[in-house]
Amino acid sequence: MACAAVMIPGLLRCSVGAIRIEAASLRLTLSTLRHLTLTSIMKSKRKTDHMERTASVLRREIVSAAKVCGAASESPSVKSLRLLVADQDFSFKAGQWVDFFIPGVSVVGGFSICSSPRLLEQERVIELAVKYTNHPPALWVHNTCTLDCEVAVRVGGEFFFDPQPADASRNLVLIAGGVGINPLLSILRHAADLLREQANKRNGYEIGTIKLFYSAKNTSELLFKKNILDLVNEFPEKIACSLHVTKQTTQINAELKPYITEGRITEKEIRDHISKETLFYICGPPPMTDFFSKQLENNHVPKEHICFEKWW
């Protein structure tokens, strides 16, 4: 995953009280981190290596150890992880990713966080969803990782949604392809937290409407369907979604059918949501992000209103 920005069923739960980790033991030394990073870059001959692609992208200085406290299959090809990060200095903005350091694996992974910042604040937990590939970090997640495995994480990325209370209200259009849903789900969940906060306290950031366009090969590969529809039903006047499948071969179940469109997300669907109050966040394969960012520019959407992240 590289960043370019122009501005569970059966999931095992955990709590800080259930797994105690001393904060002092969660830090990697700077020399150790430098060794891990340089080793990864030198040993990887892939042009798509996460550390190489994101070398110029801003990162936080804090590197925190984390313990796997939950895992589940989100689809036939995607496994989700819950990580307990007890370090109180560890934080992130909705949409950002982590460098993922695995003991014994020289290659550093790069995975977007799909949970909201609020979950970290309340439970010291972040969630990731990792697609199966031959990349060593992904192979480790799918074939080796078990409960209580220890890793280290560092936050990075310039693709995020982090409004402040006094900021102007904005609508959001989120455009996701495949596992590109991960950072956009984090943003969607953060938006829902802001809506709840506003409803309960009558203050804080006043967010506009949120529309999610999400495309995958078939309904089995549409990740987090229940989470997304739960938010749509919780905030029917604020959150809407359009789920697209491009190679569906089985019957679509009745619960999903009202939200499903067979075929790709179209330019017209996106164009209908253009306004001066709308921010666009796009995450998916490079051809998809290139297409929609270009179409938005052609329709005179300011570049500062278009944020995108590419997945390889």
From Swiss-Prot:
CDD domains attached to this UniProt entry: FNR_like
Keyword Heme listed: no
UniProt keyword list: NAD, Oxidoreductase, Signal
Residues where NAD(+) binds: 178-183
Enzyme Commission number: 1.-.-.-
Molecular-function GO term, any one: oxidoreductase activity
SUPFAM superfamilies in the record: Ferredoxin reductase-like, C-terminal NADP-linked domain, Riboflavin synthase domain-like
Top-level EC class as recorded in UniProt: oxidoreductase
Xref: Pfam families: NAD_binding_1 (PF00175)
InterPro entries, alphabetized: FAD-bd_FR_type, FNR_nucleotide-bd, Oxidoreductase_NAD-binding, OxRdtase_FAD/NAD-bd, Riboflavin_synthase-like_b-brl
Signal peptide as annotated in the record: 1-17
Coiled-coil residues: none
Gene Ontology CC annotations of this record: mitochondrion
Domain FAD-binding FR-type: 50-186
Protein name (database record): Oxidoreductase NAD-binding domain-containing protein 1
Organism of this sequence: Homo sapiens
